[in-house]
Amino acid sequence: MEKTMSNTTPTPAAHRLGLVGRKVGMTRIFTEEGESIPVTVLDVSNNRVTQVKSLESDGYAAIQVTYGNRRASRVTKAEAGHFAKAGAEAGSILKEFRLDPTRAAEFTAGSVIAVESVFEAGQQVDVTGTTIGKGFAGTIKRHNFGSQRASHGNSRSHRVPGSIGQAQDPGRIFPGKRMAGHLGDVTRTVQNLDVVRVDVERGLLLVKGAVPGHAGGDVIVRPAVKAPAKKGA
């Protein structure tokens, strides 16, 4: 079997500068050849640096980034002081990106990171978001179980999961048993999405395919950690 990992050059997480933003929604764009490409629009505009961490003061190098805005009544005193110290407007989300010390030193608190300085068309990215919550779901919807007979003697057991254990030995249900429960509302990352277009004026990223979460949900966009190596590299 051919190994697929040989064509990839994993990038250390400590060297991946990303941006935070929100999912605007899905649409499609057309190429010059008339091909329809489904894309998700991500708003990553106005990413402000709220803190720069260094090896000397914090033990590691990183930058802290915020996105969006928040009403003053929704900001705690501690957060208000943190944003005021950075000279940045209070945001709705805070995210830290670990970087190489030299790279982190290039940023200053209060500065804005432009989308074109991080991403470009044709690049592959990893997008992290919170999936849409589905509430309490049964095994058919949650784990793709098959249903039982609709008739022929079956009554009130059409969508039940069936046996969930054995007998007195082992006398318990094994951990990890697939059963009914809460579905969705978890953090998930979709890898290797192609950046189709970068809207510099509006700070938008158009990535091919779907990303986790509902429209308006927070997302984190990073350069793909498993991006294929460039030819000739």
Swiss-Prot record:
Residues 147-170 are annotated as: Disordered. One of its GO terms (biological process) is translation. Signal peptide: none annotated. GO terms for molecular function: rRNA binding; structural constituent of ribosome. One of its GO terms (cellular component) is cytosolic large ribosomal subunit. The keyword Heme does not apply. Keywords: Methylation, Ribonucleoprotein, Ribosomal protein, RNA-binding, rRNA-binding. Methylated by PrmB. The keyword Ribosomal protein applies. One of the primary rRNA binding proteins, it binds directly near the 3'-end of the 23S rRNA, where it nucleates assembly of the 50S subunit. PANTHER family: 50S RIBOSOMAL PROTEIN L3, LARGE RIBOSOMAL SUBUNIT PROTEIN UL3C. Part of the 50S ribosomal subunit. Forms a cluster with proteins L14 and L19. Belongs to the universal ribosomal protein uL3 family. This is Large ribosomal subunit protein uL3. It comes from Bordetella avium (strain 197N). The lineage of its organism: Bacteria, Pseudomonadati, Pseudomonadota, Betaproteobacteria, Burkholderiales. The gene is rplC.
